[in-house]
Amino acid sequence: ATTDSPATLTGVI
């Protein structure tokens, strides 16, 4: 994804 959070980073959200 575009954010910096661990979950979004990996593309889970």
Curated annotation (Swiss-Prot):
Under which main EC class is this enzyme filed?
oxidoreductase
Please describe what this protein does: Stores iron in a soluble, non-toxic, readily available form. Important for iron homeostasis. Has ferroxidase activity. Iron is taken up in the ferrous form and deposited as ferric hydroxides after oxidation.
Misc: On the 2D-gel the determined pI of this protein is: 4.74, its MW is: 25.7 kDa.
UniProt EC number: 1.16.3.1
Protein name per the record: Ferritin-2, chloroplastic
What is this protein's tissue specificity according to the annotation? Leaves.
> What broad class describes the main subcellular location of this protein?
plastid
User: What family name appears in the similarity comment?
Assistant: Belongs to the ferritin family.
Subunit arrangement?
Answer: Oligomer of 24 subunits. There are two types of subunits: L (light) chain and H (heavy) chain. The major chain can be light or heavy, depending on the species and tissue type. The functional molecule forms a roughly spherical shell with a diameter of 12 nm and contains a central cavity into which the insoluble mineral iron core is deposited.
Q: Which reaction does it catalyse?
A: 4 Fe(2+) + O2 + 4 H(+) = 4 Fe(3+) + 2 H2O
Where does it live in the cell? Plastid, Chloroplast inner membrane
Q: Does the keyword Oxidoreductase apply?
A: yes
Q: Which UniProt keywords apply?
A: Chloroplast, Iron, Iron storage, Membrane, Metal-binding, Oxidoreductase, Plastid, Plastid inner membrane
Q: Name one GO molecular function term.
A: metal ion binding
Q: Which GO terms describe its cellular component?
A: chloroplast inner membrane
User: What are the recorded Gene Ontology BP terms?
Assistant: intracellular iron ion homeostasis
Q: Does the keyword Chloroplast apply?
A: yes
